[in-house]
């Protein structure tokens, strides 16, 4: 069974209410049909043949929520109602109000728009002041690696990088079920090179150890030292994760985004995500090039997040 199939099977054991915010897109409509038919989730479709936010009785509650959360951005109730009719904001509002367990958007909206809606309506979880993302890379050899951050935070500070790593490690426990082994990646391994980026990764590693001393982690490590045991023995002897890392933390968005696409297209890996991390309640993004299967997989991922959080 593939990783995507495992996710779907797990979600089907406890189907969750997931808002699909772009029901007017044929891919989303087909994904909703299959999610319902296969009992993977209970889809709540916004747009298309689904809910029209402007006519939904919950619109005023979503508008009030948006106004209360961002009084500096909303001048009055009329503007709040107008903002709440946006399908992505409306979807996020339903999750924040407990009318749904999770939401998925991004098939026709930009990542930036989905992020703004999620932060505005839902907000970040306690201990996580940074929204970030991860891809779950299912390799042909059967391994599943977590790549973070590949879609959201362009140039994280050391503290942000540590919290991004913590969010990824926590979600890996929920989605994959194994013990996270976190590698903070760099072009240097244990002082083999220097520079501002290397310094950032070292500081982030120490910050992570303070945040989560119970989780195995090391850095700075080059990719080969993180993934190949023979290389780790030479470059990082005694590393608690050398050669066996399963959570790869990239120093910036350039590195993370480039890496996941290279592994996807050159190594034949299946990329599940991007999955948002650090939110109070689950909501996630889609690539605008997402297939129906991609939408179903991301829906299963946010459903698993919701189940693990008990929402």
Language model regions located:
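Anion-binding alpha/beta catalytic cores of soluble intermediary-metabolism enzymes, centered on
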Residues: 1-45, 52-242, 247-311
């Amino acid at each position: 069974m593939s990783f995507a199939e495992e996710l779907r099977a797990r979600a089907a054991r406890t189907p969750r209410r997931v808002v699909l915010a772009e029901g007017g897109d044929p891919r989303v409509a087909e994904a909703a049909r299959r999610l319902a038919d296969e009992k993977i989730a209970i889809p709540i479709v916004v747009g298309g043949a689904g809910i029209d936010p402007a006519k939904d009785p919950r619109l005023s509650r979503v508008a009030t929520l948006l106004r209360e959360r961002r009084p500096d951005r909303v001048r009055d109730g009329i503007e709040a109602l107008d903002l709440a009719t946006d399908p992505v904001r409306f979807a996020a509002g339903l999750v924040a109000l407990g009318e749904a367990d999770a939401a998925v958007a991004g098939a026709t909206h930009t990542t930036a728009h989905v992020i703004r809606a999620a932060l505005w309506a839902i907000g970040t979880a306690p201990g996580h002041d940074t929204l970030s993302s991860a891809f779950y890379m299912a390799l042909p050899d059967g391994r599943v690696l977590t790549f973070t951050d590949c879609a959201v935070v362009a140039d994280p500070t050391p503290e942000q990088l540590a919290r991004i790593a913590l969010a990824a490690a926590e979600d890996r426990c929920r989605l994959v079920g194994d013990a996270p082994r976190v590698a903070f990646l760099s072009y240097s391994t244990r002082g083999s090179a220097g520079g501002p980026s290397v310094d950032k990764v070292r500081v982030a590693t120490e910050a992570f150890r303070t945040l989560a001393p119970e989780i195995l982690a090391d850095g700075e490590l080059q990719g080969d030292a993180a993934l190949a045991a023979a290389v780790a023995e030479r470059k990082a002897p005694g590393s608690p994760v050398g050669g066996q890392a399963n959570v790869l933390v990239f120093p910036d968005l350039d590195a993370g985004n480039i890496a996941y696409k290279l592994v996807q297209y050159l190594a034949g890996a299946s990329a599940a995500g991007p999955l948002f991390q650090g939110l109070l309640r689950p909501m996630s993004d889609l690539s605008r090039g997402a297939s129906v299967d991609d939408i179903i997989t991301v829906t299963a991922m946010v459903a698993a997040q919701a189940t693990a959080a008990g929402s």
